[in-house]
A protein has these predicted regions:
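Individual alpha-helical transmembrane segments in multi-pass integral membrane proteins
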Residues: 4-92, 106-125, 152, 170-184
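Membrane-interface helix termini and inter-helical loops of multi-pass transporters
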Residues: 95-105
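Interfacial "cap-and-anchor" motif at the non-cytosolic start of specific transmembrane alpha-helices
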Residues: 26, 140-212
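Juxtamembrane membrane-water interface segments of multi-pass membrane proteins
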Residues: 1-5, 61-71, 129-146, 193-206
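Hydrophobic membrane-targeting alpha-helices
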Residues: 24-28, 59, 63, 129-133, ...
Length: 212
């Protein structure tokens, strides 16, 4: 990515990759027991993955040359609410367990269903938008959106399958999902970024309107 000129799109791609790397790093720290307490690493990891869905939605809008509006604003708003909850609520994350292939997190019962709806909901929205917009666009935008959609499906399909087959794996959904996120990271780096560099139209930026 260092070869490419930084645009709104490449900044979003870099942000997604950094957050994925942060979560992978926190898993290593949790199970390696380095420096910080496990609860601190859990909060850092959950904070990182909570910010991923709105960034993906925002990226889809820019790749499709759509102006980010209420949907993107709502995605960011919901992510900030969950981010604040996991960062500051005392009992939001009470512990973790390390397994061979993933980590489970003990989260407050009241947050499990809302957070699952939040995460899967925005992933489905992103998949739907990329599927709906891609066929109507020229080749570079189409290729980038289809690559992003493939990345979404790489998260949704394996994770959903695992949790259906092994109900006890539900607590490990964030860890399992980010295990498959290497596919998304590869697509962002090798396909979405190169295709986005070929785009000629001006990208829409995203700004919140202040009431003053």
């Amino acid at each position: 990515l260092w070869r490419y000129k930084f645009t709104a799109i490449t900044r979003l791609i870099v942000s997604l990759l950094v957050l994925l790397a942060v979560f992978q790093g926190t898993e290593f720290m949790l199970c390696g027991g380095l420096a910080l307490e496990g609860g601190t690493w859990s909060k850092i990891g959950y904070g990182a993955i909570t910010l991923l869905p709105p960034l993906g939605i925002h990226l889809a809008y820019l790749l499709a040359n759509k102006k980010p509006g209420k949907v993107v604003a709502f995605a960011y708003t919901t992510s900030v609410l969950f981010f604040a909850y996991f960062a500051f609520a005392t009992q939001a994350i009470s512990g973790h367990t390390c397994y061979a292939n993933y980590v489970t997190f003990n989260t407050a019962n009241g947050s499990t269903i809302p957070y699952t709806i939040y995460y899967y909901g925005w992933l489905f929205v992103g998949t739907f938008l990329t599927y709906m917009w891609a066929p109507t666009l020229h080749k570079h935008r189409k290729a980038a959106l289809y690559a992003l959609m493939t990345g979404y499906l790489a998260l949704l399909i394996p994770t959903t399958t695992v949790t259906i087959l092994w109900n006890e794996a539900i607590a490990g959904i964030p860890s399992i999902m980010c295990g498959f996120a290497v596919i998304l990271a590869g697509l962002l780096t090798l396909k979405v970024a190169p295709e986005s560099i070929k785009l000629k139209k001006t990208h829409h930026s995203f700004h919140f309107k202040l009431p003053f």
